[in-house]
Amino acid sequence: MLEKCPIIALDFSDLASVTTFLEHFPKEELLFVKIGMELYYSEGPSIIRYIKSLGHRIFLDLKLHDIPNTVRSSMSVLAKLGIDMTNVHAAGGVEMMKAAREGLGEGPILLAVTQLTSTSQEQMQVDQHINLSVVDSVCHYAQKAQEAGLDGVVASAQEVKQIKKQTNEHFICLTPGIRPPQTNQLDDQKRTMTPEQARIVGADYIVVGRPITKAENPYQAYLDIKEEWNRIK
């Protein structure tokens, strides 16, 4: 099995913070990074071009959710930036997800966000008025994403096994909310797992933010998580 790299969440507000963070890493260490709303809205497409110029892969995490035509045209624009992965909200429906696939083309990986890892059972039922268990809701969205031709979903590692059962083993599961075993910091994430646990249940990608970006030695923290992530063969 090929060695996998954890995706580093670049949860910064500007380019200066990003460049300072990346200085902790050797230039030959090619990374897979996540650019979210805050950084993208602050710096725009130039941040994509900068990161790509360094040779890193990019997961552009904007979670598009709009009418199909708007999502299609937006994805067409994003495709020109050379991103490697992006996403939409599964709640937008099958037609919107199909439109996203059409706009993005077949190059980048396209994922659907199911339920955020910050969402609890109670919040989902009260705020979203979904009277299912979290895992049933996630699996429902995963099946709809597969129907729409997407490559996979973003979901908690706790739901990965069931997602693979309901779709297939090749359907990608990207899992945020990953925390090393020695950390007690849960922040706003409610459904979390360690890198090793995520690999055991079958996650294909993991996203790690603060345990790396806030570490005293970010590069060593990254290597430790990468080693744990690849421990299960």
UniProtKB/Swiss-Prot annotation:
Substrate binds at residues 11, 34, 61-70, 117, 179, 189, 209-210. Coiled coil: none annotated. Pathway: Pyrimidine metabolism; UMP biosynthesis via de novo pathway; UMP from orotate: step 2/2. GO terms for biological process: 'de novo' pyrimidine nucleobase biosynthetic process; 'de novo' UMP biosynthetic process. One of its GO terms (molecular function) is orotidine-5'-phosphate decarboxylase activity. One of its GO terms (cellular component) is cytosol. The active site is at 63 (proton donor). Keywords: Decarboxylase, Lyase, Pyrimidine biosynthesis. PANTHER family: OROTIDINE 5'-PHOSPHATE DECARBOXYLASE (PTHR32119:SF2). HAMAP family: OMPdecase_type1_B (MF_01200_B). Homodimer. This is Orotidine 5'-phosphate decarboxylase. The lineage of its organism: Bacteria, Bacillati, Bacillota, Bacilli, Lactobacillales. The gene is pyrF.
